[in-house]
């Protein structure tokens, strides 16, 4: 009897492995990912089955379902909002901008003011001032929140805003902020702040969808001012963590119609997390005196396309003279790697700035496996020396730049909900150029000899680490 049960169990495990392999074949977004999962599920189903159901599913089906329901619940609000936006929409001047609009499913807006916020002190002073000036409502969304000195100051500012009658909606990622105690939010809730986790495993049906995260960092005040970028809430983002030292990051402060794009992304996330449709201001404010054009590009695992990866590839292909990129994690998919190499081969000044110090060791090691190909193609790789580099910024020629939350890795491309602000404006690009030139002055350039001279065991470890790139 016991042997029959064991045999039946083994047969069922292998059958489930075969069924899951077919699912991986039909749903994986890359051929490399499909091959890796199929081989693992058929050969080692005892280990691969739980890994696949926890980490291997490429789309966030719960969010997809919620988007379908939105057709009945939210479409009327979106229609009114888009009608209000018509006077503030610019016709795309080039096919490149048109492609970004198509990926974003949001329009290019005019009459915006985009301002760079460099490093933590300037960013949080700006954010806290925005909280203090809020009159009607506040929308806040972060990946990581800590109950340290900075987190306590944020909480105090929110409590003060709530007491003067401001409606506050606070969304956080339940995995990114898993170390935060419940008492932090309970105090806010007692003051009337509405708080919700963004959890991809919400509900019995979606209990295995643990690998999707909401990596967006957004704040919107009254539908008139918005902030987006790389900063989470914790003292390490002020450069006060002994392990990381000085923290180099970039945020963006935005005024104008583009703010409503940030608001729409938050609004949709809030609806997924809570089921609520919150009442917000959808009337755009135009700042014609500082006419930056802006497209807000949300991306995530519920999209029909790999929006983040396609956006990066489009921006690379649009560069004619210069493409400067900064990212804390640099393990791009094959499409982005090929686009970067081709850009360098056609004479574009391609520079990639990455940290000298590792934050996530597996991701750090993975990069060594393909850096030689990058360097041989003419791409210049720089490592930022003082502290940890966390900014996600791109500069395209003298004409456009992006600031957002997307890292150049598979997690940002396919597993995380992210957001990018694309600003096709020469004056804004000049500001980004000045900022990055200062950063490059604090970097060292990586040589191909440095990579090739690494011991064999380190090369083997890097190649092995790279195999895990689809789920890093």
Predicted regions and their residues:
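Histidine/acidic-residue-rich catalytic or RNA/ligand-binding cores of hydrolases
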Residues: 334-337, 364-366, 395-396, 414
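Helical hairpin unit composed of two closely spaced alpha helices linked by a short loop
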Residues: 329-351, 355-360
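N-terminal localization/anchoring segments of enzymes in phospholipid and broader phosphate metabolism
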Residues: 1-310, 314, 318, 358, ...
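Catalytic-core elements of nucleic-acid end-processing and repair enzymes
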Residues: 392
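Phosphate-/nucleic-acid-contacting segments
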Residues: 322
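Thr-Gly-centered strand-to-loop micro-motif
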Residues: 325-327, 384, 403-404
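Cytochrome P450 I-helix active-site segment
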Residues: 191, 349, 353-360, 367-368, ...
